[in-house]
Amino acid sequence: MIEFLKSFLFGIVEGITEWLPISSTGHLILLNQFVKLDVSEEFYSMFEVVIQLGAILAVVILFWNQIFPFGAPEGSHTVRRRQAKHAHRKKKSGNGILSYVKMDIIILWLKVLVACIPAIVIGMPFNDLFEKWFYKYPCVAIALIIFGIAFIIVENNHKGKPAKINSMDELTYKTAFLIGLFQLIAAIFPGTSRSGATIVGALILGVSRTVAAEFTFVLAIPVMFGASLLKLVKFGLNFTGTEAIILLIGMVTAFVSSIIVIQFLMGYIKKHDFKVFGYYRIVLGILVILYALFLA
């Protein structure tokens, strides 16, 4: 029963920290030190993957209408807007199959694919090596602090300045690729925060906060699914009934908490900037250093 409660707690922490730009890795490392799951190291790696999948599913559900490129309910505001915007494309395709394809979403996925190139070429092949080199307290703490400072500096520099890119349509392939390079930093250095790195990168490139967050969430789907599937293949599916329940509890909890956090964040950034997360990261980074020096 205690392990089930721990799984519940881990799921909540994953759901909260995966989408807020504060590093899920840093939080899970600390949590596992104070509330350690009584499982093998191999199973814990599997557990991290499964609760991450729960978090990803939340994005798929929340952004379904923005990411599914085929068909749409008639009469919706989104459909009417797309129909007006892409009327010339529909005239060319007539009433055939192409008339059910949302070209703006196809283009979005092409941009996501371009942004994934750095992770595919460098991040995934060398993932184990990066974990071996950098999955340590000092690296996590430094990454937390550096990107915390980056958030504060970027927001201060952009204060009062209008964003250059205010919609997904305005996001170019070049900008998408550059955001992908920032994502690669998170793949190399744990504690950076994948969402934190991509959002900082997007803000530097002139993307609005809302578009930066939305693109970050959509970009997470292939990247995190790919990384999770690689680990699942590596570790296999050999676990007991009790372990299966632990996995299920963690996954469901991560899914539900992710739904809540994503909705909160999208509402929050409409009126506020990201500086509060920068200050939080700096404080957490200092705490990680103190823990490593005196308690680890």
Which role fits each region the language model picked out?
Residues M1-A296:
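Multi-pass membrane proteins that catalyze or facilitate reactions on polyprenyl-/lipid-phosphate substrates
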